[in-house]
Amino acid sequence: MAGNSIGQLFRVTTCGESHGVGLMAIVDGVPPGLALTEEDLQKDLDRRKPGTSKFATQRKEPDQVEIISGVFEGKTTGTPIGLLIRNTDQKSKDYGNIAQTFRPGHADYTYTQKYGFRDYRGGGRSSARETAMRVAAGAIAKKYLAEKFGVLIRGHVTQIGNEVAEKLDWNEVPNNPFFCGDVDAVPRFEALVTSLREQGTSCGAKLEILAEKVPVGWGEPVFDRLDADIAHAMMSINAVKGVEIGDGFAVAGQFGHETRDELTSHGFLANHAGGILGGISSGQTIRVAIALKPTASITTPGKTINLNREDTDVLTKGRHDPCVGVRATPIAEAMLAIVLMDHFLRHRAQNADVVPPFAPIEP
């Protein structure tokens, strides 16, 4: 099965299934000398792990990461870093009823048609469970970028279903299970998700992820533009159906004289492009937004077919998120960090000796 690696010089490869023994990752390309402990990774894993609130899946996994290689005496050695998280709370019996049927809206049908066989327990490899390793790997990238450049990567939820957050206070984001910066929106989010669970359905979400203090010059035109690789990384996250960079789809209704991000000797006058021009970072804050679809794992009966191609009904059991966007923020942060780390190394490899004609202008 191909497609389990991302990045060129900073390369992350993951493996593992929802109800298997555990999850693993190999993170290659980490420069030597970075002080790194399991606790550095655990902070973000704890933000993503299931069972932490009544608004997410009640599967309880400690997601305790183990560093099994690539770190010696508390520092990275420059060799591949091996990471392991063991699964502890699988309930495979919950999925016996779908062994012969396909859950509509899931990867069951396509995995079976592509591979001729599938692990039906919790979705197997297609489960969002695999994103735990992305978060662990992304935490390494976040730490390196923060220490070397002061890069700050952080995200927040802007919409749950039809409820929209109207303001952003970063101090509020870690204080609620929705990663929302609008304290007034949180009760509305809570009421909506509670109602959806009672109704046996689910809803989508929208998140914004920012990367501040990214140096100018990262990105490899034309096919590996920074925004192209960011979009690729974000679209690889389960349930993501749309990605916006900067003003995103709103540009269709804008005018050039309003949105060309004019610049002066003192800095840029706007950031409609989201910190990327011509596929290269401009030094401004990189702004990314993603939209996640409602999970199809709901307790409302639906129509499907079985392995004999016979019509049947299906009722999804198991422990699922009524809104997958609730826990997606640290995942999206991790994917942005992985892409930025890769592009830093690629830029350094080719352009380390380049002397720009003048110092970068201020964002």
Curated annotation (Swiss-Prot):
Q: What does the note accompanying the cofactor annotation read?
A: Reduced FMN (FMNH(2)).
Molecular function as annotated in GO: chorismate synthase activity; FMN binding
Q: Which GO terms describe its biological process?
A: amino acid biosynthetic process; aromatic amino acid family biosynthetic process; chorismate biosynthetic process
Q: Which controlled-vocabulary keywords does the entry list? A: Amino-acid biosynthesis, Aromatic amino acid biosynthesis, FAD, Flavoprotein, FMN, Lyase, NADP
Query: Which organism is this entry from?
Result: Acinetobacter baumannii (strain AYE)
- Residues engaged in binding NADP(+): 48
Family affiliation: Belongs to the chorismate synthase family.
Please name the InterPro entries in this protein's record. Chorismate_synth (IPR000453), Chorismate_synth_AroC_sf (IPR035904), Chorismate_synthase_CS (IPR020541)
List, alphabetically, the HAMAP family matched: Chorismate_synth (MF_00300)
Lineage, top-rank taxon, reads Bacteria
Pathway assignment reads:
Metabolic intermediate biosynthesis; chorismate biosynthesis; chorismate from D-erythrose 4-phosphate and phosphoenolpyruvate: step 7/7
Function, please?
This reaction introduces a second double bond into the aromatic ring system.
Q: Name one GO cellular component term.
A: cytosol
Which PROSITE patterns does this entry report, sorted A to Z? CHORISMATE_SYNTHASE_1 (PS00787), CHORISMATE_SYNTHASE_2 (PS00788), CHORISMATE_SYNTHASE_3 (PS00789)
Enzyme Commission numbers on file: 4.2.3.5
Q: How does it assemble?
A: Homotetramer.
What gene makes this protein?
Answer: aroC
List, separated by semicolons, the cofactors it needs. Answer: FMNH2
Q: Which PANTHER family does this one have?
A: CHORISMATE SYNTHASE
Q: Where does FMN bind?
A: 125-127, 238-239, 278, 293-297, 319
Instruction: List the catalysed reactions.
Output: 5-O-(1-carboxyvinyl)-3-phosphoshikimate = chorismate + phosphate
Name the UniProt record assigns to this protein? Chorismate synthase
Which is a Pfam family this sequence falls into?
Answer: Chorismate_synt
